[in-house]
Amino acid sequence: MLTNLRIFAMSHQTIPSVCINNICCYKIRASLKRLKPHVPLGRNCSSLPGLIGNDIKSLHSIINPPIAKIRNIGIMAHIDAGKTTTTERILYYSGYTRSLGDVDDGDTVTDFMAQERERGITIQSAAVTFDWKGYRVNLIDTPGHVDFTLEVERCLRVLDGAVAVFDASAGVEAQTLTVWRQADKHNIPRICFLNKMDKTGASFKYAVESIREKLKAKPLLLQLPIGEAKTFKGVVDVVTKEKLLWNCNSNDGKDFERKPLLEMNDPELLKETTEARNALIEQVADLDDEFADLVLEEFSENFDLLPAEKLQTAIHRVTLAQTAVPVLCGSALKNKGIQPLLDAVTMYLPSPEECNCEFLQWYKDDLCALAFKVLHDKQRGPLVFMRIYSGTIKPQLAIHNINGNCTERISRLLLPFADQHVEIPSLTAGNIALTVGLKHTATGDTIVSSKSSALAAARRAEREGEKKHRQNSEAERLVLAGVEIPEPVFFCTIEPPSVSKQPDLEHALKCLQREDPSLKVRLDPDSGQTVLCGMGELHIEIIHDRIKREYGLEAYLGPLQVAYRETILNSVRATDTLDRTLGDKRHLVTVEVEARPTETTSVMPVIEYAESIHEGLLKVSQEAIENGIYSACLQGPLLGSPIQDVAITLHSLTIHPGTSTTMISACVSRCVQKALKKADKQVLEPLMNLEVTVARDYLSPVLADLAQRRGNIQEIQTRQDNKVVIGFVPLAEIMGYSTVLRTLTSGSATFALELSTNQAMNPQDQNTLLNRRSGLT
């Protein structure tokens, strides 16, 4: 059963026998005895969690540790802050790899896609399971590039805690703000790691201040650096008043010593640490009443007598309450500060049972899991990553997919180790599992044990909602909590190398869409071409590359275009009648609709009904009407772009007996399109938040270039020796900007983009765009 275990290098001779009742466990033990050393991807990997060294614990404790000992964490940050390098060091010190991976060398564990290894960036979030000092840690490394924001959203949805990694020389950067807001949305406790303390320009004080000012967070300084930039050699543990120094002659950072600070050896450092500890105690006491009472009653006269364990427990409570964030520092590349970071993860971040998942009360002890990622494996088929919130998952278990309203069977259950997977007999609540055999499950789907279990949960949620005067829709949302998919901002056509390869291209795109819901694929009704819609230039480029590498198709991409949207400016009415006879059956529909602009932003049309219609409307007819409205709003009258910020009201509807739902949809769609054409129309263009970090000498040419791109500069900040330009710029004007910026600044500047909103174009720019699209200019 455990053929995949052969990837782990172990000595089978020293594994003692274990009494295991389950027949599956006997198979696992037998497989362990047959293991042969094998090195995947040129790396030395250690054993399955719990099989550290020559000892093997009970199999249940290896696979399913106590829930209090589980930590589901993610690593999040701005691009190039050092997330993947930090992850590699974590895996190495936890005993899960036997050599240090390097992003520049392309041999990291969590960057397992070919494009990731080549580009040195993380595209997909890879889940890794390892042990640290008796704790089970499920860790997800996430991308920092704005084009892959969905990957961050996807993993944050299933995490209990997170490590935010910062470049100590840059502090809070643009994408850091984005992922921090996402973590706020999901109420995820965080700890901060100030990385790259060895880098020229690194400033602990500046980085901490940027967390306080830009993130509006209260930093708890648990460590102080010993030196900065080239002089950085270790950290001081403020809580225990100890210094941690790494051996300069050690190549891997495992060799470090922890010494108590003494007056005779480090008087200045001891004084600074004592002041920092006293400030920390006061700060935590202000945030935690229980700790404040303890300090006032027993340690008010001398904070030095306060035990470190009491302070650590209080910091844990404050972190869970999200009233402050612990701050640590180090250098992942130089192998300093990672072991204390791991200690902080187990000490301060929550276990699954400490997280308040309100929807769990509807399921009690039944299975409830969320599919948060889908991958396609050529041998195994679809691989679905799941976060188990309650119950147990086993191989051959039949499960019910609430979103897809279908029942499937899990054929195999795996423990994820980046792109290496180990087969296991069961997984319980709090864990992250990898399942094989689910062919219809997609990202964001809620998985339960059966349809009856889902109905029972819905009834409990509805009853509770009535007690709290909630709408049914909110109770339903609690049961079907999923992953929010952002709207794409770029699109281009894609064609196969030949007509005979069209089915292969469609299969590849279908698989990629299941893996990445932010990728949208549609058929252009006018040209019949397949259109790819994505989150950015890099996103589309990566998809194109994957089609070539993974599916062997040399597909051709059309020019990249901006995904504009359209809206209307006034209220209009329209009527339409569809009268058609097919065979001996007459289909007759008469519709009157009103289209008007909405006051709030709404990507999907808001659908309303006149009272006289809604009362007697059949459900199938209502679905047909809404399908017709949605279809009409997919293509606006100006550019053929989707319509947004519009409300459609159905004022009258006459349906002849025997009329099919297809004819109802067609009539409603045609009527809505007629109304949209009559209205005053407006093109909306994507407006991006832009942050450019540039040396002072190159500031003027950068500002001049942005002015030509219709940029709106909000402010110019000073960051160390650089200037940071913050503003807005239309997406259409920023295509290919990286090449221009490199030329203007001799390659010294960096920039970050994030979608802000869709703004109305001015009449002149709109006319220019329409003329260009129609071929007049």
From Swiss-Prot:
CDD domains membership: EF-G (cd01886), EFG_III (cd16262), EFG_mtEFG_C (cd03713), mtEFG2_II_like (cd04092), mtEFG2_like_IV (cd01693)
GO cellular component: mitochondrion
Domain tr-type G residue range list: 68-353
Keyword terms of this UniProt record: GTP-binding, Hydrolase, Mitochondrion, Nucleotide-binding, Protein biosynthesis
Xref: Pfam families: EF-G_D2, EFG_C, EFG_III, EFG_IV, GTP_EFTU
Binding site for GTP: 77-84, 141-145, 195-198
Domain of life: Eukaryota
Biological process (GO), any one: mitochondrial translation
Subcellular location: Mitochondrion
One GO MF term attached to the UniProt entry: GTPase activity
E.C. number: 3.6.5.-
SUPFAM superfamilies for the chain: EF-G C-terminal domain-like, P-loop containing nucleoside triphosphate hydrolases, Ribosomal protein S5 domain 2-like, Translation proteins
Catalytic activity: GTP + H2O = GDP + phosphate + H(+)
Function: Mitochondrial GTPase that mediates the disassembly of ribosomes from messenger RNA at the termination of mitochondrial protein biosynthesis. Acts in collaboration with MRRF. GTP hydrolysis follows the ribosome disassembly and probably occurs on the ribosome large subunit. Not involved in the GTP-dependent ribosomal translocation step during translation elongation.
Other remarks in the entry: This protein may be expected to contain an N-terminal transit peptide but none has been predicted.
Family indicated by similarity: Belongs to the TRAFAC class translation factor GTPase superfamily. Classic translation factor GTPase family. EF-G/EF-2 subfamily.
Name the record gives this protein: Ribosome-releasing factor 2, mitochondrial
Gene: GFM2
